Amino acid sequence: MWFKNLQLHRLPAPWKVSVEQMEKWLAPHAFQPANSVETTRQGWTSPRNNGSLVYSINQQMLITYRAEKKLLPASVVTQVTKARALELEEQQGFKPGRKQMRDLKEQVTDELLPRAFSIQRDTRVWIDTVNGWLVIDAASQALGDDVLGLLVKSVDRLPISSVRVAQAPVAAMTNWLLAGEGPVNFTLDQDTELRSPAEGNATVRYVGHALEADDMRRHIEAGKQCMRLAMTWNDRVSFVMTPSLTIKRVTALDVIKEASDPTAQNDDEQFDSDFTLMTGELAKLFDGVVDALGGELDEGSKAA
């Protein structure tokens, strides 16, 4: 159940909001399947499929965003529209004009939508009301923006802000590669990407390859900067850091997996244990990442 890709946002620490209040905010935006003429739908759904829109334990909340999309290939619409256009041409004795073609396409789309397949995708959101984190489990920035957009619409005056650190992640990652070692409690793994900001964006990627200090220095002296860096925190969690501070490819290592509660009697107890373990470890990881980047900035301060 561990989150894999972490888009981080800040909340007040602590954020004094109850589960009941959160349920009240989300309920008007609960997910409902798209009707016959809609191509997309979004809303909140139960994280545990028990009717509740908010799962909570130890002041850690979990909510789930669901998006539905109808699959209606443009090629199918075009094919049917062309066939209808030929029929119309025979009836009226001349080819349909632009407006007629546009109307035909809209008509065909409306007719085909009820028969279109639909897909639903869920995206999880963790709200740490104690330490003031809001975390979206999404690799795509566009998806994260969609989730955040609905959350802002749902929650009355959501007190959210971006994470602002003293040192830009690109500069920090580049310096760590130059030094050949990570900051305190972090080790460098064997995946990285270096890219030149100059025209052409010359890029070098290392995957499962030792990051030799001489090689790193040569690339950096040539003007390249580190854009992705695989790291491990405290021998407990491995991940990839990015320029936007999105933490990707999060993996709990064996020492954490072994800490999972062996006495759990059912799925609910196991979920409680796993979620508590994940939120506790990741909250400490976030503190470590922020410290490694020089700490958080006050409003109005600029990153180095």
UniProtKB/Swiss-Prot annotation:
Organism domain of life: Bacteria
One Pfam assignment: RdgC
Signal peptide limits: none
GO BP term, example: regulation of DNA recombination
Keyword set, alphabetical order: Cytoplasm, DNA recombination
A single GO cellular-component term on record: bacterial nucleoid
Location (main, coarse): cytoplasm
Keyword Cytoplasm: yes
Function: May be involved in recombination.
Family: Belongs to the RdgC family.
Protein name: Recombination-associated protein RdgC
